[in-house]
Amino acid sequence: MDEELYSRQLYVLGLPAMQRIQEAKVLLCGLQGLGAEVAKNLVLTGVGSLTLHDPHPTCWADLAAQCFLSEESLGRNRAEASQAQLAQLNEAVQISVHSGDITEDLLQGFQVVVLTDSKLEDQLKVGPLCHKHGVRFLMAETRGLVGRLFCDFGEDFTVLDPTEVEPMTAAIQDISQGFPGIVTLRGDTKRHSFHDGDLVIFSDIEGMVELNSCSPQSVRVQKDGSLEIGDTTTFSRYLRGGVVTEVKRPKTVRHKPLDIALLQPHVVAQNTQEVQRAHCLHQAFHVLHKFQQLHGRLPKPWDPDDAETVVELAQDLEPLKGTEEESLDEALLRTIALSSAGTLSPMAAIMGGVAAQEVLKAISRKFMPLDQWLYFDALECLPEDETLLPSPEDCQPRNCRYDGQIAVFGTDLQEKLSDQHYLLVGAGAIGCEMLKVFALVGLGVRANGGVTVADMDYIERSNLSRQFLFRPKDVRRPKAEVAAAAAHRLNPDLRATPYTCPLDPTTEDIYDDSFFSRVNGVVAALDSFQARHYVAARCTHYLKPLLEAGTQGTWGSASVFVPYVTEAYRGPASDAASEDAPYPVCTLRHIPSSMEHSVQWAQDQFEGLFRLSTETINCYQQTCTSLSATDRTETLALLQQVMGVLRTRPQTWQDCVVWALGHWQLCFHDKVLEGGTQFSSGSNKCPHPLQFDPNHDMHFLYVLAAANLYARMHGLPGSQSQPALRELLTRLLESDSRPQNLFSAEHGQEQLKELQETLDDWRKGPPLKPVLFVKDDDSNFHVDFVVAATDLRCQNYGILPVNHARIKQIVGRIIPAIATSTAVVAGLLGLELYKVVSGLRSHGTFRHSYLHLAENHFIRSAPSAPAVQSFRDLKWTCWDRLKVPAVQPERTLKSLLAHLQEEHGLKVEMLLHHQALLYSSGWSSEKQAQHLCLRVTELVQHVTGWKPKPGLKVLVFELSCEGEEEEMAFPPLHYEL
């Protein structure tokens, strides 16, 4: 298992599921856009082998949604033309092409068979055969703006891990001896999520140790939150500690074969209205297949005669079982028929992402599969005004790469897409998928258009399992540059420009008024809430549409914000603040009660020892020459933070090991009972010191990692030889060569003199090398140090530690990720892109989307219209602003305030610029007079020290006015220069 490559999806699937995936054999039939999306996601995820089958040659319409085909592929077999590029995504996956017939014997050689965009007769042939032989079967297809997916995993399919949620755990406060036994949980975990009937196991209990080896116990939850278990009468008396952990129950799924499920469809839907629409879509697909059987083709694009034929065929269909009272929606059916010949990249991405996730469920037995039909439509992308719908002539093939898209929307939208200029912020997983969408739909391919790709990050190997535009040779190269070049290869007409500087307050001279004046819209593909909020604020300021998406594991969301049409982006209020919220220092230093506390403490140790200490010492040596009694308090307070490294400069690897061993002793023995006071408060156990044991894995790992990091900091060669280190540790322990603390608590003259001598010695050598934490290099000992320090800290305080991967996730703030959900949210944004570029102006047309692929939840809802606020005769929304035109000579603050009162009836009480107070009616008359006479730009410079940069067109102010209500927020004041 290449854990570095698959690290992000291992947090989603787990190691056992990934091992099953790597051993699986999958047959994929159909390599149009939808099939290519399924293939891409499976190869990125790392299936064992993928066999491609498609007997058809590449045509122009395929290029609208198939990113592995090009104009050079025209006339070539689709599977053969796609094979080489798919193989580049993951060299560990065996990819082959089957060019013969699909026979019963062939099917039995695979765990999963997938048909995409296939004929009904092929579906009815392959589906029942797979059911007969226990081969999991999936069928997916798209027709224009509608799509469907069918799953048949057999009559007795066991799901080993039904949910994405980690098993619940809780710390134990007490366990009674009795029948039943009562498990009291610690005070901070009473509000748990255990339910009656849950199975649990126990671990790390002292005293009542019999429970540690018991089989899973069923619990009943009491009113006070305690758990009732079986008979504990004969067990030993409970003393302390312990953790109760949920055991997930496997679930069995029973699926019908396709031939039966077609007549008795069970659809995934969130409400009755969705069920009825899904039944209509089910009938629509059925009649489209019937039309295709009769005419050898799908209905012609926007041909009214063909659409009427489809409606007539539907009237002859037998009602679905259980739907006899549902009437056929002829208008919906007619619209589906008119656009069914088209092929769209966003639809392929959505259905391909969901289908690939179902394949992974079939292989890994992790997460609940669909039961059994999923229908999806985005017909709201079409104009509501029938006079604006495309004509048959406008949708005729033009032998170009956009023919599949023109068949749905006509040439008008294609022309608009070509002239768009979009800013893509973030070239990670979602960013790569969005560049694919841009390339396939033809966005920014003419001289007036383009795509600016902004990302300051560099490619890491762990990116390659999701960010499909990158290859192993691209590791350590800028994401923006590589992604822009790769997108150009997908569509040579795409005008993609990379920017490797961040989009944040420090670069507003780059992403300035002139830059945003050229941009038609923004796509935010960011994993930082703080960055999302900033980008959204820029879009609101410049009145640009914002398409925004994010994922975490199999969760995903996609949202759209259009000026004056929808609400503006706000996001949860706590998002940005919670990203960097630390634990209380007192908790980290003295009374950790959870593994998370220990992880944070270990990370602080890393930063303090190997980065901050070196920076502090280097800075001090460059700026200070002596320590005097007058400045010793401040100076020593600073240097006290780095006392752990203020020793004789190491000269050899052994010196580094001696230091690491001494620091182990200091942290996990000497300081644990500092002052000789043991305690146990609330949920905290009495701490106990550790005795160093070179044969203990974590003791040894700590010294190995710390010594190597210390050596690197001093520019010395380290060592990865574990046998040699064990031998060295044995000698050191026998000779008791561990160092003593260099400094005492008192900082008198002797201490100052000793410290001065140490610093003088260090100044003679080269500066230290700060070690910056890098989470994705398993050979650099960074994560090893934090893992070992966390584990040892947990041992000190009786906290049950967790595995290496979980600690790495916490310390690296790693977001679980998988290719499937990324593809889906990008496809959803692609649909909203159609609407924005089309110029649709009804907020009810747009969609915010939320999905959870693990549990088959798909929710799409219309965004709210922007809320209207009013003050006297003034009305505004979040998209409005008070504009003050430029005049010569420039206005003074006094004339600006007079203008606002005369034009808008606003008597300003406070005026702010970037939180700097420029004016307050509560000031003294003298201070007001000083400010009122200044010109506005002079005032800003006087108060903030900031001088407006050349080219700046607008200054933005916030204001508070007389008579405003408490919850009122006036629109920003845009002062034109």
From Swiss-Prot:
Compartments, record wording: Cytoplasm; Nucleus
Main location (coarse class): cytoplasm
Effect of gene knockout: UBA7-deletion mice display increased susceptibility to viral infection.
InterPro entries, per the entry: E1_4HB, E1_FCCH, E1_FCCH_sf, ThiF/MoeB/HesA, ThiF_NAD_FAD-bd, Ub-activating_enz_E1_C, Ub-E1_IAD_1, UBA_E1_C_sf
EC number: 6.2.1.-
GO BP annotations listed: innate immune response; ISG15-protein conjugation; modification-dependent protein catabolic process
Post-translational modification: Ubiquitinated by RNF170.
GO terms assigned for molecular function: ISG15 activating enzyme activity; ubiquitin activating enzyme activity
Keywords per UniProt: Cytoplasm, Ligase, Nucleus, Ubl conjugation
A cellular component term, taken from the record's GO annotations: nucleus
Pfam families: E1_4HB (PF16191), E1_FCCH (PF16190), E1_UFD (PF09358), ThiF (PF00899), UBA_E1_SCCH (PF10585)
Class in the EC hierarchy, top level: ligase
Pathway named in the protein's UniProt entry: Protein modification; protein ubiquitination
Alphabetized CDD domains for the sequence: Ube1_repeat1 (cd01491)
Record's function text: E1-activating enzyme that catalyzes the covalent conjugation of the ubiquitin-like protein product of ISG15 to additional interferons stimulated proteins (ISGs) as well as other cellular proteins such as P53 in a process termed protein ISGylation. Plays an essential role in antiviral immunity together with ISG15 by restricting the replication of many viruses including rabies virus, influenza virus, sindbis virus or rotavirus.
NCBIfam families: Ube1
PANTHER family in UniProt: SUMO-ACTIVATING ENZYME SUBUNIT 1, UBIQUITIN-ACTIVATING ENZYME E1
Family: Belongs to the ubiquitin-activating E1 family.
Name of this chain's protein: Ubiquitin-like modifier-activating enzyme 7
